[in-house]
C-alpha cells in the first residue's frame, strides 16, 4: 500500500513535527548534492530550524555563491534602471503633452473659439467659468480703485497740512515786513520834517555854486603873429596887438 496524501498544514504535534523536519531536511540536502554533481551546477542551500539552528550546503561554498548572487542581482537592477527611467520619462512627457493640449483648448474656448464641437453642458460650464472670471475681475478692479482713492485722499490731506503751514508762515513774515515798512516810513517822515536832525544828516544834492568860496576860472588869450611881405621889399615881423583878436579879461 502507498502512502496517503499529506495535508499541507502545520503539524501540531511537536515530536512528529521534529521528525518530519529531520527527514525532509536530509532529503533536501541530498537532492541539492545530487543536483550539483549530476548537472555540474552551483548550488547553495541554507536552512533555519524553528529553534533557529542553521543547516547549510554549498557546492563551491556558501559565501562564494552569495557574492555571485549579489553581483548578478545588482547588475540586473542597473540594467533595468535606465529602461525604467526612460519609460517613466516617456509617461511624464505624455501627461504633460495631454495637459498642454487641454490648456490650449480651454484657452481658445475662453476666447470664444472652437465652440462648434462643444455640447450644451460644456457651454454652460464655460459660461459659469466666464461669469466667475468676470466677477473676480470686477472685484479686483473695485479694490484697486478704492486703494488709489485712499492714496489720493492721503496726499490731499498732506497737501492741505503743508498749505496751512505755508499760510501761517506767510502771514507771520508779512506782518514782520509790514512792521519794518512802517518803521521805515516813520523814519523817512521825521527826517523830511527836521533836516538838521543829527541822527540822519542830509547833504544837498545840488549845492549853490555862488555860495562856494572859490576864485573864478581865468582863461588867458593868445597873440597871433603875421608876417606881411610888400612888393619889392621885405617887412620884418611885427606885433600888432589890435589886429590879432587878442582876448584879455576874466571869463566866468
UniProtKB/Swiss-Prot annotation:
Name its species.
Answer: Arabidopsis thaliana (Mouse-ear cress)
Q: What is this protein called?
A: Agamous-like MADS-box protein AGL6
Q: Where in the cell is it found?
A: Nucleus
Gene designation:
AGL6
Can you provide one Gene Ontology molecular function annotated for this UniProt record?
transcription cis-regulatory region binding
An example Gene Ontology biological process? cell differentiation
Annotated coiled-coil segments of the chain: 91-173
The K-box domain, residue ranges: 86-176
- Which PROSITE patterns does this chain map to? K_BOX (PS51297), MADS_BOX_1 (PS00350), MADS_BOX_2 (PS50066)
Gene3D superfamilies recorded: Transcription factor, MADS-box
Q: Per the record, what is one GO cellular component?
A: nucleus
Q: Which ranges carry the MADS-box domain?
A: 3-57
Under the subunit heading, UniProt states:
Forms a heterodimer with AGAMOUS. Interacts with AGL15 and AGL16.
UniProt tissue specificity: Preferentially expressed in flowers.
SMART domains in the record, alphabetically? MADS
- Pfam families given for it? K-box, SRF-TF
**Which UniProt keywords are given for this protein, alphabetically ordered?**
Coiled coil, Developmental protein, Differentiation, DNA-binding, Flowering, Nucleus, Transcription, Transcription regulation
What domain of life? Answer: Eukaryota
What is the role of this chain?
Probable transcription factor. Forms a heterodimer via the K-box domain with AG, that could be involved in genes regulation during floral meristem development.
Amino acid at each position: 500500500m502507498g502512502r496517503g496524501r499529506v495535508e499541507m498544514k502545520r503539524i501540531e504535534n511537536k515530536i512528529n513535527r521534529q521528525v518530519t523536519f529531520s527527514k525532509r531536511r536530509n532529503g533536501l540536502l541530498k537532492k541539492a548534492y545530487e543536483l550539483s554533481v549530476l548537472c555540474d551546477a552551483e548550488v547553495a542551500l541554507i536552512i533555519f530550524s524553528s529553534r533557529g539552528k542553521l543547516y547549510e550546503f554549498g557546492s563551491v561554498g556558501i559565501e562564494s555563491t552569495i557574492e555571485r548572487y549579489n553581483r548578478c542581482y545588482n547588475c540586473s537592477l542597473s540594467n533595468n534602471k535606465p529602461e525604467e527611467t526612460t519609460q517613466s520619462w516617456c509617461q511624464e512627457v505624455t501627461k504633460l503633452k495631454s495637459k498642454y493640449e487641454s490648456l490650449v483648448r480651454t484657452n481658445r474656448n475662453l476666447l470664444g473659439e472652437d465652440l462648434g464641437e462643444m455640447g450644451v453642458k460644456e457651454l454652460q460650464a464655460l459660461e459659469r467659468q466666464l461669469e466667475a472670471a468676470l466677477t473676480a475681475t470686477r472685484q479686483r478692479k473695485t479694490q484697486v480703485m478704492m486703494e488709489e482713492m485712499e492714496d489720493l485722499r492721503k496726499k490731499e490731506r498732506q497737501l492741505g497740512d503743508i498749505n496751512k503751514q505755508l499760510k501761517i508762515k506767510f502771514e507771520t513774515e508779512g506782518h514782520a515786513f509790514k512792521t519794518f515798512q512802517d518803521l521805515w516810513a516813520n523814519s523817512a517822515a521825521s527826517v523830511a520834517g527836521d533836516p538838521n536832525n543829527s541822527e540822519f544828516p542830509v547833504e544837498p544834492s545840488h549845492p549853490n555854486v555862488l555860495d562856494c568860496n572859490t576864485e573864478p576860472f581865468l582863461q588867458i588869450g593868445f597873440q597871433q603873429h603875421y608876417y606881411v611881405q610888400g612888393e619889392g621889399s621885405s617887412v620884418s615881423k611885427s606885433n600888432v596887438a589890435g589886429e590879432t583878436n587878442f582876448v584879455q579879461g576874466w571869463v566866468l
